[in-house]
Amino acid sequence: MSIRARVEDAEFLWKHERYEGAFLSALSAVAATARLRYPDRKTTKDGDAFRQFLKGGKGGELGVEFRGDVHSIEHIFYKWLRCELVHEGGLPVDIQFMPDASPGALSIRAGGKPEFILKLSHGWFHYLLSLVANAPENRGVFEQ
């Protein structure tokens, strides 16, 4: 299987409203692309490669309050989305997806009482796929 197949799987699952599976496939494509960018497993662990790849996709640092601490968005995607989906088979109960406020918006809602739920807009899914598709490491992979 290839990174392109992971992206196609993600898009198929998303179209059929299987959001967790779609995110898992998208995050798998991110992880595989990150490993292409940072191939030395001795100097760069999987989680570090994943976070560094995501950090390279945007300017600045985005911190989000979650579970009583402020975490980078890259850490949230790695620890509480990628790792939970891979190792536990689902998202934590305190993370949910929400529709975009406007098309393509990257929104995060860190809820306080009574919910204490972190909500991520659908735009994040599309953002992850665009990072993978536009990564120099994947040049030619997505061209028809």
Model regions: which residues?
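Amphipathic alpha-helical interface elements
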Residues: 1-53, 69-73, 77, 87, ...
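Long, charged low-complexity segments
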Residues: 55-144
